[in-house]
Structure formats: C-alpha cells, structure tokens
UniProtKB/Swiss-Prot annotation:
SUPFAM superfamilies: Ribosomal protein S6. The keyword Acetylation does not apply. Residues 107-144 have a biased composition (Basic and acidic residues). Residues 95-144 are annotated as: Disordered. InterPro entries: Ribosomal_bS6, Ribosomal_bS6_sf, Ribosomal_S6_plastid/chlpt, Transl_elong_EF1B/ribsomal_bS6. Pfam families: Ribosomal_S6. It comes from Paramagnetospirillum magneticum (strain ATCC 700264 / AMB-1) (Magnetospirillum magneticum). Binds together with bS18 to 16S ribosomal RNA. The lineage of its organism: Bacteria, Pseudomonadati, Pseudomonadota, Alphaproteobacteria, Rhodospirillales. This is Small ribosomal subunit protein bS6. Keywords: Ribonucleoprotein, Ribosomal protein, RNA-binding, rRNA-binding. Belongs to the bacterial ribosomal protein bS6 family. One of its GO terms (molecular function) is small ribosomal subunit rRNA binding. GO terms for biological process: translation. NCBIfam families: S6 (TIGR00166).
Length: 144
C-alpha cells in the first residue's frame, strides 16, 4: 500500500459538522477499499486566493492515508462528484508526518499575543515624566 496526503476545500456555506460528516464519508471509502486514515485535520474556514465556484472562503481538511491506489481513486472520484467539495489535491509521499502539520503549528503560533499587545509597559506617548511643551499660537505679522 502507498502513503498519500489529501487536502480538500469544502464550500464556505456548509457548517463545520457537515464538513466532519463529509470527512467521515471519505474516510469510510478508504477503509472499505482496504486502507486506513491515520490523521484528519480540520484547518478551519480560510480565505481562498481566488474565487472558486463563487466562493471566496472554504473549509480546509487534511487527510493522511495509507491505502491502495484503487481506494484513493474511488475517494477522488467521489470528491469530484460531491457539490460541497471545491478543490482537492492528493499526492503520494514517502512517509507520513507525525504530529500536527505545518498549518496547525502556524495556527497555534497565531494564538500568541502579538508584539506590543498585552504588555503592561507604558507606551512612549504615555510618558508623564516629560514636560508638556505648550506654546502660544503664532500670529501673522501685519495682519491685525
């Protein structure tokens, strides 16, 4: 059996439980074909680089698959028939990644506070130790 990574994008107007149901249906196709799905990752609702079938966003899902090629072809056929699937990409790999994918790692990095957020330090413009430089308004010469 060969190892595959499959990423698919589902329509933006379906709910997260519907995406999970779709993922389970695709996993069942693989298991019925004699393979197994070792990892299922839901990457969330993300922007698409360009409009695909009138959608600007999509639910991204990653599957790590260990299956014969016939099962993978059947899964790809079912995805092409399904209206909820916008795009798919299935590639054959030498070995499957253990742990979270790069997308999930970057997602956890985005959860950290950004630089300057959450600091208790005073900001430069909030310093009270500097004297205020109030000056009188300028007058135009020869006007009044």
């Amino acid at each position: 059996m060969s190892l595959y990574e499959c990423v698919f994008i589902a329509r933006q107007d379906i709910s997260t439980p519907q995406v999970e149901t779709l993922t389970e249906e695709l996993s069942n196709i693989i298991t019925q074909g004699g393979g197994s799905v070792s990892k299922k990752e839901y990457w969330g609702l993300r922007n698409i680089a360009y409009r695909v079938k009138k959608n600007r966003k999509g639910h991204y899902v990653l599957l790590n698959i260990d299956a014969p090629s016939a099962a993978v072809k059947e899964m790809e056929r079912q995805m092409s028939i399904n209206e909820d699937v916008l795009r798919t990409l299935t590639i054959r790999v030498e070995e499957l990644e253990e742990g979270p994918s790069a997308m999930m790692q970057s997602k956890s990095r985005d959860d950290r506070p950004r630089r300057g957020e959450g600091d208790d330090r005073p900001r430069r413009d909030d310093r009270e130790d500097r004297p205020r430089r109030d000056r009188e308004p300028r007058r135009m010469e020869g006007g009044e």
